[in-house]
UniProtKB/Swiss-Prot annotation:
<dbReference type="Pfam" id="PF02021">
    <property type="entry name" value="UPF0102"/>
</dbReference>
<dbReference type="InterPro" id="IPR011856">
    <property type="entry name" value="tRNA_endonuc-like_dom_sf"/>
</dbReference>
<dbReference type="InterPro" id="IPR011335">
    <property type="entry name" value="Restrct_endonuc-II-like"/>
</dbReference>
<dbReference type="GO" id="GO:0003676">
    <property type="term" value="F:nucleic acid binding"/>
</dbReference>
<protein>
    <recommendedName>
        <fullName>UPF0102 protein HD_0802</fullName>
    </recommendedName>
</protein>
<comment type="similarity">
    <text>Belongs to the UPF0102 family.</text>
</comment>
<dbReference type="InterPro" id="IPR003509">
    <property type="entry name" value="UPF0102_YraN-like"/>
</dbReference>
Length: 126
């Protein structure tokens, strides 16, 4: 049975958790090390925090079953990007007493579109 059909009856939250787990496993296969998942702050949330070498990688996981309302990547608008940056800054302050200005970090996206393999975009925020 297709992945999308199995997910039809799940809530959005459990669907999100399923794809976050798939993204985590995919990134671990690419050599990244898992640090934390689902970090929530008043200013925003972080889906996955990973590490590649000495770089902290903040990962946004997006999925779309079809493009009727735009692609997974198109759903990461300016407002979402700002919340992502703010949450990462809070995480760095909490965990390492650093900020985005001083830490070695980047922002990646893992996008799932219908039955396609995951699309990993490194340094999405450039």
């Amino acid at each position: 049975m297709a992945l999308w059909k199995r997910l039809t009856n799940r809530t959005n939250r459990s669907q999100g958790a399923c794809f976050e787990q798939k993204a985590r496993l995919f990134l671990e296969q690419q050599g990244l090390k898992f640090i934390q998942a689902n970090q929530h702050f008043k200013c925003g949330e972080l889906d996955l925090v990973m590490q590649q070498g000495d770089t902290i990688v903040f990962v946004e996981v997006r999925q779309r079953k079809n493009n009727r309302f735009g692609s997974a990547l198109e759903s990461i608008d300016y407002r979402k990007q700002q919340k992502w940056l703010d949450a990462a800054n809070m995480w760095l302050l909490t965990e390492y007493n650093q900020s985005l200005d001083t830490a070695n970090c980047r922002f990646d996206v893992v996008a799932f579109e219908a039955e396609q393999p995951p699309l990993w975009i490194q340094n999405f925020l450039g």
